[in-house]
Design a protein with these regions (language model features):
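Terminal accessory/targeting
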Residues: 1-151, 238-241, 246-251, 257-266
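Conserved hydrophobic/aromatic pocket- or pore-lining residues that grip, position, or stack substrates
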Residues: 66, 174, 225
Length: 266
């Protein structure tokens, strides 16, 4: 991502926009251009060395979900709920949603919460023999921009995380809004996740996640994740367009442009 430190355009959330990229301007953002170059190189190599063998890769699907707001009702005060109900009735014109909020709060039952779709997502993932990853926030550095200010140590969230793990799915970090350029904050948030999962007996062979709002600064964000002990990052998509921000559909080792060093982070 050499162009990102060089080109200075940023959007309202200080993100490098797809529209400023060479790929978008040249019309190949929706093509994995690096992978296409590899295929051309391989075709040339086969002509020169017909007996050469190539490592075969299998296709895999990785499903990941940012947990910005785990519940709409369960962890809210009546004041917040009535404000949302007013919006349901006057803006969204959805009486059933308003009634569902009241029912969930009165019964104190998170399974009735309209935002509680975790089991639905896991059921659907398992139907197709897939594992889902759920990225939790462990700190909220920007108030409402970070969704609902839930606590990762709360009983409801720890029960949810343990249920995800018991069903064979994965837990990860969703870095808060202001953490992307703050190495100390990323370290703090990941340590909090590790402390909580350790208490719950959650063990994984690797840990990853994604930055909130896809906020990213090269090379600070990647280096911060590496230094904090994370193994992989899935932030590198664009917020304003779909496409291949890194020009590939394969995972790859990260390169720090300042230190000229390949990182362990992928």
């Amino acid at each position: 991502r050499y162009e990102e430190p060089v080109i200075k355009e940023r959007d309202a959330h200080n993100r490098f926009p797809a529209t400023s990229s060479v790929a978008y301007k040249s019309g190949f953002l929706n093509r994995p251009i690096v992978d296409e170059y590899v295929e051309i190189l391989w075709a040339c190599m086969k002509l020169l060395w017909p007996g050469i063998q190539r490592k075969q890769h299998s296709y895999r699907v990785f499903l990941s979900h940012d947990v910005d707001r785990p519940f709409f009702v369960y962890d809210q005060s009546w004041h917040q709920i009535f404000r949302n109900i007013a919006g349901d009735l006057t803006i969204r014109k959805d009486l059933s949603l308003a009634l569902q909020r009241i029912k969930c709060k009165v019964r104190n039952d998170s399974t009735l919460d309209p935002a509680n779709t975790f089991d639905f997502i896991m059921d659907l993932s398992e139907k197709y023999d897939l594992k889902s990853e759920f990225y939790f926030m462990t700190d909220h550095t920007a108030g409402s921009l970070d969704g609902s200010e839930y606590s990762i140590e709360s009983l409801q969230i720890t029960k949810l995380m343990h249920r995800i793990y018991e069903r064979g799915h994965r837990i990860g970090l969703h870095g808060s809004y202001n953490s992307f350029s703050n190495p100390q904050q990323i370290k703090k948030e990941f340590e909090r996740l590790m402390k909580t999962t350790e208490k719950l007996g959650i063990k994984q062979d690797s840990w990853g996640g994604r930055q909130h709002y896809l906020r990213f600064e090269n090379p600070i964000t990647w280096q911060s994740w590496e230094d904090a002990g994370l193994n992989y990052d899935s932030t590198l998509g664009f917020a304003d367009n779909i496409g291949f921000r890194c020009g590939t559909c394969h995972e790859f080792p990260v390169f720090n442009l300042e230190t000229k060093r390949v990182l362990h982070l992928r």
